């Protein structure tokens, strides 16, 4: 829970100043605009902290009203908003077997995955801040698309009732894409369509300025904008095309920084996956374990490290990696 607020404060107050990984994009957002109402970074962090504690309390109350004990409600609210995923049961959030708890958890994970600076702007009176943020638009659109597709797959191909399919897809997809790690079913057994989806969304994470880990949605936006601009240059060599993020032009420095981040991320992932494979793990376990470790998700894929497995059975050398 403390790590969750720490990630937010770093993303808002520190990383933009360090100008690494494309985070300098948020220097104007987290410093200049917010300083009009809250002049110092410490005040911004304090306001974000109040929001964070408030959301934790709201989700604890919701879990309690949904049927959890007071202790379980508080414990799960702390790991839901922080997208940490720790549960008081080995069966994770699925232990409670409650649709109400599942959907409340899904909503909490989404809340934790959105930019907290936007919550602050909303409370300051900018009611359109959340809807106008393109990073939020991309993230929620991606989540909705994945839920619809996976629900359809479970319903049509796995013969699961539509209501159950929607519930399973919603909770587990949101959990993995946000890096929370709650599970209610072994999604590794959902078939050939679901397996690659869960593998690739491990890398995504949520929005910058949220409690999530992963690559973050804004970097995919910058990558897309840069690639789109290059394609336009190829088609019209004499044209002038400028990549944009959130309706603001993206500098070459930001693009270079984001591309460097992608390179270092996947270089580290490749080394880790190859190392796990060298130690005797099968392809699926090695690659998904590397992905879930570097993205700080939790469950991987396969019988060893999947939702129904545990890293305990891995060789000691693999655990060190």
Mark where each language-model region is.
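Membrane-proximal intracellular helices of multi-pass ion channels
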Residues: 1-321
């Amino acid at each position: 829970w403390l790590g969750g607020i720490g990630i937010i404060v770093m993303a808002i107050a520190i990383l933009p100043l360090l100008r690494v990984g494309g985070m300098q994009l948020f220097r104007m957002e987290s410093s200049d605009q917010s300083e009009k109402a809250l002049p110092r970074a410490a005040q911004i962090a304090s306001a974000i902290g109040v929001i964070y504690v408030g959301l934790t309390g709201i989700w604890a109350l919701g879990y309690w009203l949904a049927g959890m004990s007071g202790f379980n409600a508080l414990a799960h609210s702390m790991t839901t908003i922080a997208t940490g995923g720790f549960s008081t049961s080995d069966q994770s959030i699925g232990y409670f077997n409650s649709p109400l708890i599942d959907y409340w958890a899904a909503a909490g994970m989404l809340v934790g995955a959105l930019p907290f600076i936007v919550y602050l702007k909303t409370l300051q009176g900018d009611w359109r801040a959340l809807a106008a943020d393109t990073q939020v638009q991309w993230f929620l659109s991606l989540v909705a698309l994945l839920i619809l597709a996976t629900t359809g797959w479970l319903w049509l191909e796995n013969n699961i009732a539509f209501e159950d399919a929607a519930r399973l897809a919603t909770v587990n997809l949101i959990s993995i894409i946000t890096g929370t790690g709650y599970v209610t079913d072994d999604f590794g057994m959902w078939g050939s369509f679901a397996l690659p989806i869960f593998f690739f969304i491990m890398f995504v994470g949520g929005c910058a300025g949220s409690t999530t880990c992963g690559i973050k949605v804004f970097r995919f936006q910058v990558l897309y904008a840069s690639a789109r601009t290059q394609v336009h240059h190829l088609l019209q060599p004499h044209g002038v095309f400028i990549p944009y993020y959130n309706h603001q032009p993206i500098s070459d420095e930001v693009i270079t920084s984001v591309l460097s981040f992608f390179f270092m991320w996947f270089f580290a992932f490749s080394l880790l996956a190859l190392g796990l494979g060298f130690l005797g793990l099968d392809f699926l376990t090695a690659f998904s374990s590397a992905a879930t470790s570097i993205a700080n998700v939790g469950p991987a894929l396969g019988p060893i490290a999947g939702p129904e497995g545990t890293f305990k059975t891995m060789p000691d050398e693999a655990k060190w990696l």
